[in-house]
């Protein structure tokens, strides 16, 4: 198992699938799954390649979800080894996507083969939902596949997303939920003028600063047992011509909420609008809703995952909702139980991204153990 998962991870890393490119990764996966009895369906939407593969027609349905695309490598000369040439060094496997998340994809394949070989007449169905649009704008990836599946009433019971959830040891953290995400792009209109004649101008920086201060100091909620309090962060502010003697005519800013299940996106929008309307300036906001918070608090999937990790590693796992968003936010609203479990995330998106080779073999065994507990 360890040799096979390593070889597959290397093959995937060597395919330069910078988002939204798939670079043949899904074809490799399809060729691996087809002999195991999977029906393969390619769903191409614009520049994005997706794969829905399924073995079985009945329920319950266990789905592995993941992505073949990776973020750009950055300057290749800053890497110790070429970013798109998988390289083994001192027990680690280096390459872009090693941890996020080609190692997980390889482990899913090997685990599935091992399980199906032992249990050819397993109950229910096993599925794979794979996209090349997770690291990009997430418009034509998982969300479009889910729309297609929902239209034909094809449901998942359980879904394991292979995002790198572990922090210091494989399986030490499992994501059983994620916060929601809401982005606002605001434009504040002023009147440009000379700094020596402020009475003839309207400075959008001065006009909006008190409002931004109030937004930053607002207590949105207290969180709950599963989620921290909702966070508001301004990520960008731009205004001015660059000249020291010109009052700017407008201001643009971007801010983001990461919110708990204690509030909704509509409630946040209403509260922001109420605060801004207290101040006398002209503004416009374009809202981008990135996903609702979701939580898989308990159930067979969480229990099977905790048990499999304990069996393979001997350790208890921590359930967490911390961190950014994932494609789990598109899957959870269908009613599926969703968790995320993958390699250590310390080097993801960084120069010299790498994964521990032994961890890959353990991850495959954990994945197989989850299948064993749910579908054997």
UniProtKB/Swiss-Prot annotation:
Binds 2 Zn(2+) or Co(2+) ions per subunit. It catalyses: N-succinyl-(2S,6S)-2,6-diaminopimelate + H2O = (2S,6S)-2,6-diaminopimelate + succinate. Its EC number is 3.5.1.18. Its cofactor is Zn(2+); Co(2+). Pathway: Amino-acid biosynthesis; L-lysine biosynthesis via DAP pathway; LL-2,6-diaminopimelate from (S)-tetrahydrodipicolinate (succinylase route): step 3/3. Zn(2+) 1 binds at residues 67, 100, 163. The keyword Transit peptide does not apply. The active site is at 69, 134 (proton acceptor). GO terms for biological process: diaminopimelate biosynthetic process; L-arginine biosynthetic process; lysine biosynthetic process via diaminopimelate. It comes from the Bacteria. Keywords: Amino-acid biosynthesis, Cobalt, Diaminopimelate biosynthesis, Hydrolase, Lysine biosynthesis, Metal-binding, Zinc. One of its GO terms (molecular function) is zinc ion binding. It is an enzyme of class 3 (hydrolase). The keyword Zinc applies. Zn(2+) 2 binds at residues 100, 135, 349. Belongs to the peptidase M20A family. DapE subfamily. Homodimer. Catalyzes the hydrolysis of N-succinyl-L,L-diaminopimelic acid (SDAP), forming succinate and LL-2,6-diaminopimelate (DAP), an intermediate involved in the bacterial biosynthesis of lysine and meso-diaminopimelic acid, an essential component of bacterial cell walls. This is Succinyl-diaminopimelate desuccinylase. It comes from Pseudoalteromonas atlantica (strain T6c / ATCC BAA-1087). The gene is dapE.
